[in-house]
């Protein structure tokens, strides 16, 4: 299946503890998950590595969230929107299903 959610897309969270929040996609994983900036923060207990000069402690970082729990945010309508594909000038482009506008990459 084609990637309907891509890196740097503005998305809104549909389910989970961060429901309703907006953020930018920083990474899309092949397992069908995405990492969103500032969303799904978890605390990781990190061991110190003196050889590399890394300090130990509790580090807060973003965890992956399933792609089915996010939707691309349409700034024109101010809501979450579905994505479709069409061919324009011989190129495959993404568009919003609600208003037909092309999604900027």
From Swiss-Prot:
Database matches in PROSITE patterns: RIBOSOMAL_L24 (PS01108)
Superkingdom of origin: Bacteria
GO molecular function, one term: rRNA binding
Transmembrane residue ranges: none
Keywords in alphabetical order: Ribonucleoprotein, Ribosomal protein, RNA-binding, rRNA-binding
CDD domains listed in its UniProt record: KOW_RPL26 (cd06089)
SMART domains the record matches: KOW
Gene Ontology annotations for the cellular component aspect, listed alphabetically: ribonucleoprotein complex; ribosome
InterPro entries noted in UniProt: KOW, Rib_uL2_dom2, Ribosomal_uL24, Ribosomal_uL24_CS, Ribosomal_uL24_KOW, Translation_prot_SH3-like_sf
GO biological process, one term: translation
Function: One of two assembly initiator proteins, it binds directly to the 5'-end of the 23S rRNA, where it nucleates assembly of the 50S subunit. One of the proteins that surrounds the polypeptide exit tunnel on the outside of the subunit.
Family per record: Belongs to the universal ribosomal protein uL24 family.
Subunit details: Part of the 50S ribosomal subunit.
Name the record gives this protein: Large ribosomal subunit protein uL24
Originating species: Vibrio atlanticus (strain LGP32) (Vibrio splendidus (strain Mel32))
Upper taxonomic lineage: Bacteria, Pseudomonadati, Pseudomonadota, Gammaproteobacteria, Vibrionales
